[in-house]
């Protein structure tokens, strides 16, 4: 399950909870501006009802937990 707490959440210079994929960072140097291809796998079909459970989460606030993950994931 992915958690995106929004751009307003950060904890420290190395951890930004608002990043959807924190491992994929932008590089500023000219050598690093090489085109990259990211191949995403195939996921099984979602069953009806799974989305509703995830969409039911609500609330404000976020804090960074272990390994720079949003904690809790209820943003």
Swiss-Prot record:
Keywords: Metal-binding, Metal-thiolate cluster. The keyword Nucleotide-binding does not apply. The keyword Metal-binding applies. GO terms for molecular function: metal ion binding. It comes from the Eukaryota. Induction: By aluminum. Belongs to the metallothionein superfamily. Type 15 family. Metallothioneins have a high content of cysteine residues that bind various heavy metals. This is Metallothionein-like protein 1.
């Amino acid at each position: 399950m992915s958690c995106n707490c929004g751009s307003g959440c950060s904890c420290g210079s190395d951890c930004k909870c608002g990043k959807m994929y924190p491992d994929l960072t932008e590089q500023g140097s000219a050598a690093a501006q090489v085109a990259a291809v990211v191949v995403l796998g195939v996921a099984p079909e979602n069953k009806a009802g799974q989305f509703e459970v995830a969409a039911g989460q609500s609330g404000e606030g976020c804090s960074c937990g272990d390994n720079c993950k949003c904690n809790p994931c209820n943003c």
